[in-house]
UniProtKB/Swiss-Prot annotation:
InterPro entries: Aldolase_TIM (IPR013785), BATS_dom (IPR010722), Biotin_synth/BioAB (IPR002684), Biotin_synthase (IPR024177), Elp3/MiaA/NifB-like_rSAM (IPR006638), rSAM (IPR007197). Keywords: 2Fe-2S, 4Fe-4S, Biotin biosynthesis, Iron, Iron-sulfur, Metal-binding, S-adenosyl-L-methionine, Transferase. Pathway: Cofactor biosynthesis; biotin biosynthesis; biotin from 7,8-diaminononanoate: step 2/2. Pfam families: BATS, Radical_SAM. The lineage of its organism: Bacteria, Pseudomonadati, Spirochaetota, Spirochaetia, Leptospirales. Catalyzes the conversion of dethiobiotin (DTB) to biotin by the insertion of a sulfur atom into dethiobiotin via a radical-based mechanism. One of its GO terms (biological process) is biotin biosynthetic process. [4Fe-4S] cluster binds at C63, C67, C70. This is Biotin synthase.
Length: 351
């Protein structure tokens, strides 16, 4: 075992092979060795900083797609509250709250196959207002996208678009049959051609093999994806995943290490399922990942911001703000929310 570990992690920097990725997931390499090497790469590109992302579910339900993992899919009978797209003012106020909560990036998510022209223009207007008035980094996840719509969003100031591959091409037909894997990769191609940074990741635990997880990690590398959210499957009411995988905290950390070592300079983000699957190893996972979500997910609650910040600091890391500065020590206190610290917020909204 030691010889195997030394062979895999002897060079710095190193991009591991598919075979080596499988050895990480299969437990051949000691977890501490995986973490040590993953942290070397994480620290090389991101130092001791952690980026907190906050999601805003701007439209819930009314989705014609049949993604088996999703509570919003058609005919899900999941009991989620459906609502149409929020107004620009509602989304803006959510962005204000995200900035107050120390978000590095504000992530807008809408259900559906993809936006039409009118919806794209509405989203563009909202994005431009948030970036201009709040000076925030924004990510949008709105489904399938062509190059023309991507260019509209780019001109509005969008610098990141999320469209997850979710799993390998080989496994994709097992989780969705209303659109293809090719359509997803074509969306990434449109985003790239428009000059928008690509955010694309996975949901592990949907009955895929270790080979599937390794394959999609390399697929994301081939697209040069700069932000990779790693979700751990949550069996929400109404899902149709036939054989969900058993995810232990150790395996989840190994998966994050593998993604880091295949995509060393990408932002690796701990996404949905952190609280339930990583559990006591949530802080340990930050030695591989440099980003996470806080304050909940689309239809599932998550850790609140103060708890998240405390975990980050307890592990020896520091939360990074969108302007590159570090979240002040007085975060969460009245003095932190002063007009001196947030002049742009007081300019547009009285607190």
């Amino acid at each position: 075992m030691l010889k195997t570990s030394e062979k895999i992690f002897s060079e710095t920097p190193s991009i591991i092979t598919k075979e080596e990725g499988l050895k990480i997931l299969n437990g051949v390499i000691p977890l501490t060795t995986c973490l040590d090497k993953a942290f070397q790469e994480r620290n090389r590109y991101f130092e001791n900083k952690v980026r907190i992302h906050i999601l805003d579910n701007i439209k819930n339900g009314y989705c014609p797609e049949d993604c088996g993992y999703c509570a919003q899919r058609k005919n899900a009978n999941s009991g989620v509250q459906e609502y149409p797209m929020k107004s620009e003012q509602e989304i803006y106020e959510d962005a204000v709250q995200a900035k107050k909560n120390g978000a590095y990036r504000f992530c807008m998510v809408t259900s559906g196959t993809g936006p039409n022209r009118l919806t794209t223009e509405k989203l563009a207007s909202t994005i431009q207002r948030i970036t201009d008035e709040l000076n925030m980094k924004v990510c949008l996840s709105a489904g399938l996208l062509d190059i023309e719509k991507a260019q509209v969003l780019k001109e509005a100031g969008l610098d990141r678009y999320n469209h997850n591959l979710n799993t390998s091409e080989n496994h994709y037909s097992e989780i969705c049959d209303t659109h293809t894997y090719l359509q997803r990769t074509q969306t990434l191609d449109s985003v790239s051609k428009a000059g928008i940074g690509m955010c694309s990741g996975v949901i592990v635990g949907m009955g895929e093999s270790f080979q599937d997880i390794v394959d999609v990690a390399f697929q994301l590398k081939s697209f040069r994806v700069i932000s990779i959210p790693v979700n751990f499957f949550i069996p929400v009411k109404g899902h149709t995943i036939k054989n969900p995988s058993v995810l232990t905290p150790e395996l989840c950390v190994r998966i994050l290490c593998m993604f880091r070592l295949i995509n060393p300079d990408s932002e690796i983000r701990i996404a949905a399922g952190r609280e339930g699957h990583l559990r006591s190893l949530s802080a340990t996972a930050l030695f591989a990942a440099n980003s996470l979500f806080s304050s909940g997910y689309l239809n599932v609650k998550g850790s609140e911001i103060l708890e998240t910040v405390a975990m980050i600091r307890d592990a020896g890391f520091v939360p990074e703000l969108s302007n590159g500065e570090i979240l002040p020590e007085n975060f969460g206190t009245e003095s932190f929310y002063s007009e001196k610290n947030f002049p742009e917020l007081y300019k547009f909204k009285k607190f």
